[in-house]
Amino acid sequence: MKQIFIGIIRFYQKFISPMTPPTCRFYPTCSHYGLEAFQTHGALKGFWLTLKRILKCHPFHPGGFDPVPDKKDDK
C-alpha cells in the first residue's frame, strides 16, 4: 500500500510538478514531505500526515520549516 502512494507522489514530481510554478510555502515541499512521511511511518500514518500538511498549504498559513515527525513520536 505504501508503495502505491509513493508511486503517485513520484509521478506527480516527475510529470505534473515541472509544468506548474513553484508555490509550496513549506520546506521540505509538500511532495517531499509526503514521500518522507510514507517512508518513515507507513501507509496509514503517512497518509494522515501528508493530508494534514496539504490542508495547511494555503495563503493564510505562514509556511516555513515543517519536518516529518520522528518515528519515535508514534506512541
Curated annotation (Swiss-Prot):
Places the protein is found: Cell membrane
GO cellular component terms given for this protein: plasma membrane
InterPro entries to which the protein is assigned, alphabetical: Membr_insert_effic_factor_YidD
Membrane topology: Peripheral membrane protein
Record-linked SMART domains: Haemolytic
Key words, A-Z: Cell membrane, Membrane
UniProt cross-references to Pfam families, sorted A to Z: YidD
Residue ranges the record marks as coiled coil: none
Family according to the record: Belongs to the UPF0161 family.
Role: Could be involved in insertion of integral membrane proteins into the membrane.
Protein name: Putative membrane protein insertion efficiency factor
